[in-house]
């Protein structure tokens, strides 16, 4: 299976990348920069900036699945959670839909929709709502694990 993993070199993304590679998947590891994970480089690295849709053009072509761990994990003076967690993931979703990707998995947080006063959580909840409204996708959910939840969306 060909998988695009966005946010592949963050903490969670790196763990997912290692597992996908170990399981023998064809992986496109996309992030702003590549880092050494101490594994064989049995993946293709693509430099992206989810806030710049032009860097995403064609990134999902031929992929069966997109997994995104993209999101701010700490404060930033240059970007907001709405630009990354919401709009950036929406840019990626639009590219996945254009490429006819069958599955889209967004790694969010438990009860993001219950904390609208926290920008990072609110931005994630807003993107979850976009996924639910995506006209060419259907929703199925995976149970949460620890503090993360995976929302899986499959095309009809």
Question: What does each model-found stretch correspond to?
Answer:
Residues 2, 64-65, 103:
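Structural motif
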Residues 14-16, 39, 77-78, 115-117, ...:
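Short glycine-/acidic-enriched loop or helix-start segments at secondary-structure transitions
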Residues 3-25:
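N-terminal Rossmann NAD(P)H-binding glycine-rich loop of SDR-like oxidoreductase domains
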Residues 26-28, 33, 79-142:
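Conserved Rossmann-fold NAD(P)-dependent oxidoreductase catalytic core, especially the SDR/UDP-sugar
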Residues 35-91, 95-99, 111-113:
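NAD(P)H-binding glycine-rich loop region in Rossmannoid oxidoreductase-like domains
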Residues 118, 141-156:
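Flexible, glycine-rich beta-alpha linker
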Residues 4, 28, 46:
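Conserved Rossmann-like nucleotide-binding pocket used by diverse enzymes
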Residues 21-28, 32-42:
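A compact, surface-exposed functional segment
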């Amino acid at each position: 299976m060909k998988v695009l993993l966005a946010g592949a070199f963050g903490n969670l993304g790196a763990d997912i990348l290692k597992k996908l590679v170990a399981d023998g998947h064809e992986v496109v590891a996309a992030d702003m920069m590549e880092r050494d994970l101490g594994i064989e480089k049995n993946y293709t690295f693509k430099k992206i900036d989810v806030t710049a849709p032009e860097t995403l053009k064609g990134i999902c072509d031929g992929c069966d699945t997109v997994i995104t761990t993209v999101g701010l994990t700490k404060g930033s003076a240059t970007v907001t959670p709405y630009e990354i967690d919401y709009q950036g993931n929406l840019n990626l979703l639009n590219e996945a839909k254009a490429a006819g990707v069958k599955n889209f998995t967004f790694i969010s947080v438990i009860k993001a929709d219950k904390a609208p006063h926290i920008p990072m959580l609110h931005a994630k909840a807003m993107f979850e709502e976009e996924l639910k409204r995506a006209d060419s996708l259907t929703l199925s959910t995976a149970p949460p694990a620890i503090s993360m939840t995976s929302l899986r969306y499959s095309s009809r």
